[in-house]
């Protein structure tokens, strides 16, 4: 029997916070990026969790702001020869797997993800080997090497539907790496799921007691929760879903005040969707506790204006994403299954 890697004992060294830019410096880099995007025939693909000024720039230049599933779709279909991926490393890898003919640039190749870090490929392969009768489903937040071992890749926006489908076929599942999302999906579908025990450092920090106190302070507020959060937080929610699903819920819920339990980067697009509603951050630290991420992924914060300009200007090994071709071809199989399945859901 394999010994499972224990993410709870792993130490994830946080990157240094980017040096703040002055107003003039921000204006300089914004104009430089706009010029370089045109010169490089490039387009920005940014995740909801990047800083607001990055999302705004993606909007202004005809790029994409979305969850990881739509980032993958957009980048593959866009005619630009270069994709500037503002996010974390697995997103850049996914873009390269789906668009091998394109140049994939990232502001930094050191933008990690705690879910990815918490699922080392050697330990995961041993875990899968110990359960050969199970279908392997991995979250998009994993390395290309882990995706190679998967039968399916999935994002949070279609996780419940996919596992419900596989369960209807009588398949038993290995789910990796997020234990909270896996538990949520199991509860929603009743599927036979064996979970890897990873967690997102942002969502894992939401505190039940502190959220209860905030709810008591604002009893008229609805609570929106990403399913990467602990079960006790999910149980308090008026709406549970992926980033795009939470934005949709913000529009449909009648409440004028919303408590949001996910990375605060989502507030940029959510506030656009509901300009007349008040958005409150769910607390990440209770009494006597401190937060590490404080509701914002430290690696997402590495996607600054200066780093984006340098990526477009310098290209090369410090910014370009490469995936071994044999690895890419194998990882493409479960990714394409995900995209094909998602297309059937859209009808």
From Swiss-Prot:
Residues holding iminosuccinate: 47, 68, 139-141, 156, 226-228, 243
Gene Ontology terms for molecular function: 4 iron, 4 sulfur cluster binding; metal ion binding; quinolinate synthetase A activity
Keyword presence, RNA-binding: no
Keywords: 4Fe-4S, Cytoplasm, Iron, Iron-sulfur, Metal-binding, Pyridine nucleotide biosynthesis, Transferase
Pathway: Cofactor biosynthesis; NAD(+) biosynthesis; quinolinate from iminoaspartate: step 1/1
Chemical reaction(s) catalysed: iminosuccinate + dihydroxyacetone phosphate = quinolinate + phosphate + 2 H2O + H(+)
Cofactor: record remark: Binds 1 [4Fe-4S] cluster per subunit.
Cofactor(s) this protein cannot do without: [4Fe-4S] cluster
Cellular compartments annotated: Cytoplasm
Species for this entry: Shigella boydii serotype 18 (strain CDC 3083-94 / BS512)
Gene behind this protein: nadA
GO terms under biological process: 'de novo' NAD biosynthetic process from L-aspartate
Protein's name according to its UniProt entry: Quinolinate synthase
Pfam families assigned: NadA
Enzyme Commission number(s) from the entry: 2.5.1.72
Chief location bin: cytoplasm
InterPro entries: NadA (IPR003473), NadA_sf (IPR036094), Quinolinate_synth_A_type1 (IPR023513)
Binding site for [4Fe-4S] cluster: 113, 200, 297
């Amino acid at each position: 029997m394999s010994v499972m890697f224990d993410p709870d004992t792993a130490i994830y060294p946080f990157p240094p916070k980017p040096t703040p830019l002055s107003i003039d410096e921000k204006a300089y880099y914004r104009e430089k990026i706009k010029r370089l995007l045109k010169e490089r025939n490039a387009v920005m693909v940014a995740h909801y969790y990047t800083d607001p000024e990055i999302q705004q720039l993606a909007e202004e230049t005809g790029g994409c702001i979305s969850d990881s599933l739509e980032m993958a779709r957009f980048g593959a279909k866009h005619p630009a020869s270069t994709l500037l991926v503002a996010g974390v490393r697995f997103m850049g890898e996914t873009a390269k797997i789906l668009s091998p003919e394109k140049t994939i640039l990232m502001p930094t190749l050191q933008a990690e993800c705690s879910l990815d870090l918490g699922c080392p490929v050697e330990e995961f392969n041993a875990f899968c080997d110990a359960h050969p009768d199970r279908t392997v489903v991995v979250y998009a937040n994993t390395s290309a090497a882990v995706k190679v071992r998967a039968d399916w890749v999935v994002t949070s926006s279609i996780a419940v539907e996919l596992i419900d489908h596989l369960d209807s076929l009588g398949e038993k599942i290995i789910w990796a790496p997020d234990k909270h999302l896996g538990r949520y999906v199991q509860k929603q579908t009743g599927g036979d799921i064996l979970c890897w025990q990873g967690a997102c450092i942002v969502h894992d920090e939401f505190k039940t007691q502190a959220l209860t106190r905030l709810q008591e302070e604002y009893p008229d507020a609805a609570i929106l929760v990403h399913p990467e959060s602990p079960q006790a937080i999910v149980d308090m929610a008026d709406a549970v879903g992926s980033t795009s699903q939470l934005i949709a819920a913000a529009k449909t819920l009648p409440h004028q005040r919303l408590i949001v339990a996910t990375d605060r980067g989502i507030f940029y697009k959510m506030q656009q969707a509901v300009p007349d509603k008040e958005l409150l951050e769910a607390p990440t630290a209770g009494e006597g506790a401190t937060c590490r991420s404080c509701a914002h992924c430290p690696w997402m914060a590495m996607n600054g204006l200066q780093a984006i300009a340098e990526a477009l200007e310098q290209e090369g090994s410090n910014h370009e994403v490469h995936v071994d071709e044999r690895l890419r071809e194998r990882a493409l199989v479960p990714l394409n299954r995900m995209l094909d399945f998602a297309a059937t859901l859209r009808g």
